[in-house]
């Protein structure tokens, strides 16, 4: 059952989200995250966050396949996606517009990974292919939603980089087990509210 969940098809989804590391004045120089974290813009909240970016690759059911923590800049996110995709040769990688770029596309082609992103230009009518891409992208968005809401990713309370890595790994393990349990009992894969504990 686990092998079926992890190795289902060639489809992989990649995205990143900012994880706040500290939010007090002077945190950039006095925190244990100094030298690792920096300021980055979070478009979903319309604010700047001092922290790191979690880059996650998941399969089409939402099971995490790999992750990396990088600085919050877009270039670092692309490098992390390339490093994570190197273990996914022969797969089709769905990403949002932030991963669009000829350099990343060419680098992924060298390791036999096809990158699929939304159309770069807004079209008057959304073609069926763009709607299908958006539906597939909802899977990774729901994974991040579960991590942030049910598993309180943004309230990790980590004081060091090692502590942050440990807390993220715990949440990803809990997410994977939740998806696995849902598959065993026939529930929707990412419906984790029953395991919330609230």
Could you tell me what each predicted segment is?
Residues 44-47, 157-168:
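Structural motif
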Residues 9-10, 136, 143, 169:
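A generic secondary-structure signal marking the coil-to-beta-strand transition
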Residues 166-198:
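C-terminal domain-tail junction helix/linker
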Residues 77-81, 140, 144, 170:
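A general structural signal for well-ordered alpha-helical segments in protein cores
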Residues 1-114, 120:
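Polybasic low-complexity intrinsically disordered regions
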């Amino acid at each position: 059952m686990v092998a079926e969940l992890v190795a289902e098809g060639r489809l992989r989804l990649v995205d990143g989200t900012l994880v706040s590391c500290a939010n007090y004045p002077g945190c950039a120089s006095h925190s244990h995250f100094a030298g690792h974290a920096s300021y980055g813009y979070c478009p979903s909240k319309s604010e700047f966050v001092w922290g790191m970016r979690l880059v996650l690759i998941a399969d089409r059911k939402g099971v995490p396949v790999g992750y990396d923590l990088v600085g919050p800049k877009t270039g670092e996110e692309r490098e992390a996606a390339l490093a994570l995709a190197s273990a996914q040769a022969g797969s089709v990688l769905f990403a949002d517009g932030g991963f669009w770029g000829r350099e990343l596309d060419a680098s992924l082609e060298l390791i036999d990974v096809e990158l699929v992103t939304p159309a770069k230009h807004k079209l008057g009518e959304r073609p069926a292919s763009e709607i299908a891409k958006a539906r597939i992208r909802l899977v990774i968005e729901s994974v991040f939603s579960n991590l942030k809401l049910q598993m309180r990713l943004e309230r990790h309370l980590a004081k060091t980089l090692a502590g942050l890595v440990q807390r993220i790994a715990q949440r990803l393990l809990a997410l994977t087990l939740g998806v696995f349990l849902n598959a065993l009992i026939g529930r929707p894969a990412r419906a984790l509210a029953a395991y919330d504990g609230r």
